[in-house]
Amino acid sequence: MELNMNQYDNIESNDSPPTPSSPGEEGNVEKKEKKSGRRKINIEFIGDKSRRHITFSKRKSGIMKKAYELSTLTGTQVLLIVASETGHVYTFATPKLQPLITKQEGKTLIQACLNTPDVPPVSKDDGNNNNGNNSNNNNNSNNNNSSNNNNNGNNNNGNTNNNNGNNNNSNNNNSGNNNNNNNNNSYNNNNNNNNNNNNNNNNNNCKEEQNMNIPNERKSKNNINNNNNNQNNNQNNNQNNNNLTQPIQNLQLPLQQNIIAQQQQQLNQQAALQQQMTQQIDQKLYNLQLQQQQMQQQQQIQNISGGSGNNSNGYINGNGMNGNNNNNNNSNNIPEYGQVIIQSYRGSNSGGNNSSNNTSTNTNTNTNTNTNNNNNNSNSSNGNNSNNNSNNILPQNLTTPSPIISQPLPSIPSPSSSSSNIGNSGYSSPFSTSFSYGGYQQPFSRNYPLQSNIATNSTVSKAPSDL
């Protein structure tokens, strides 16, 4: 609703604006004496405990124009909303306008600007600021916890040298708490400033909606105050952000160091595992090479002992009992008949039991056995060092003989050219081609094949001549 305000520019003493018929009864709007064509009006300040009366001149700032305009909207009462030079907003109304504040038509007009108990000065923006305070406090509590944890974690790292090592934990915790408390205070101060700014902005919005003709000087001062408050708020916010950034950085640094240490530990574990696997592979290769070498040695031993299995000397009992050295020693050195029987018997008895433990043959033993002409037991010892003890097995159809042959040995006649030739030594035997030993008949022929169940790999030494 637009009114022609020019009709109130020149108000005489006998003129009356649209006020109540009896101003003394209806309100505090009273006529004053005429002074140079100007009319002054006393308006009561509603909401102030002192209930001050402020007088304004209608020609000074045009407030009367707004009073008349508002009176047409709310009845015969007068409502004024004035912004002071300090940026505060005052609401003025006649006494009978006060009940209209609770009504819907009055609420929609003045609820954002009138500071009364019925309408508390809390706006949506203020609510948001309160929520902001809560969020800031929550952040500060989180910072307290994080900073304390940081100090506790780094007490041993020399971060508290300035405290001379006295009560490092407590000093750090206290300093962290104090910093956080300061942050809380700064946040609260910022929010209070924001609340004031929001109130000012709301009041300015109300003034714009109600089209109040506030002087430009006051508007500019309000803007300056708002700008100053905004600058202060920005500075405080920046300071708070800096206070928050440093604890976060202090937390991130140990976390990064822990991650790097864990990665290094994992790399070390992987390197150790690879080294262990390499050692295992090397050990397996070494075992394979050792097995291969042992197999080669065993093959060589078998090749050496295999030759002794042949009845190259034609002397069956000597080969069967004493074995390996027949190829090298017994071809040219055939002992007498009776001595060979005794030596082969003793050799198989004494050396056969222990020969199982010796799987490798040293060919040097041939020389040793050949030189011990006077020791019958040396034959059995050398037989123990032969390749396989299985060569000392007696024929299956033979019973174990007694240690010493009880039968008398036959006499040994002189050699004769007509006798059968044994071996390569030129020695001739006058006996028949077969002989009896424990009931076992064996042909005595040079070219007769050896029985498969007679031991072949025992050692035969040169028979002593004086036995």
From Swiss-Prot:
GO molecular function, one term: RNA polymerase II cis-regulatory region sequence-specific DNA binding
Listed Basic and acidic residues bias regions: 206-220
Keyword Nucleus listed: yes
Bias (Low complexity): 128-205, 222-245, 301-334, 347-392, 401-440
Cross-referenced PROSITE patterns: MADS_BOX_1 (PS00350), MADS_BOX_2 (PS50066)
One Pfam family per UniProt: SRF-TF
Domain MADS-box: 36-96
UniProt keyword list: DNA-binding, Nucleus, Transcription, Transcription regulation
Lineage, uppermost ranks: Eukaryota, Amoebozoa, Evosea, Eumycetozoa, Dictyostelia
Protein name as catalogued: Serum response factor homolog B
